[in-house]
Every structure is written in C-alpha cells, then in structure tokens.
Amino acid sequence: MMNPMTSPSPQSLSARDLHEWLSSGSALQLVDVREHSELEIAPFPGQVEHLPLSESNLWLSDLPARLTTSKPIVVICHAGIRSRNFGCWLLAQGPDYDVWNLEGGIHAWSVEVDPSVPRY
C-alpha cells in the first residue's frame, strides 16, 4: 500500500481557479471519481471522464487509453479526498501525468462557482 507521506501528490486547485481555466478554454481532462448516484445528484458541468473508484476493475486496464500525459488532469469527487487519493495513485503509476486535485470537490464548486449545483 502507498505511504501518503512519501507518495507524489497532485497539485491543489481551487474551484475558482478551475472555473478560470475552463472559461479560458484551457485543454484539460476532467476525471470524476464519484459514484453514479452522486453524479445523479450533482453532475459536474461539461465533458467529464467518469471513473467511479468502486468500479476500478472495469476501467483500470483501459486507463492509459482514457488519459493522456499531454493535458493536465483535474480529478473531482465530493469533497476532495477520494480525488486526492486517486491523484496520488495516478502519479505513482506514471510520473509524466500532470495531476490536479479539485480542493473541496463538487461541494466547493457549488459554494464558490455555481450555486445551481446541488449540495449533498
């Protein structure tokens, strides 16, 4: 198992900064690791690669085809914890990935950027 104290960590990104990146047209890969039921409650706007952590056995072998090292990867979850853990794991798989964690997750997005996104 990974030791979080010695594992590479994703860079932190605030909801406002992510909004600026998206508004400017920056080429990003958005990865949402929440469960299907969470997406039904509060979907993240735009094109997002949905990789629920509980279903990693279904997508893990396809991961190199789904993600590229040529664009930053922003990982999203509910509060920023699962996304950070996935980001740490992803960096351990391929240090060439440029991984960012949405601090505070979809909750922060709802509070700081888009209050129309439901909170749960």
Spell out what each predicted region is.
Residues I76:
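Short, surface-exposed ligand- or partner-binding patches at beta-edge/loop junctions that are enriched
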Residues M2-Q29, H36-P72, I81-Y120:
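Rhodanese-like catalytic fold shared by cysteine-dependent sulfurtransferases
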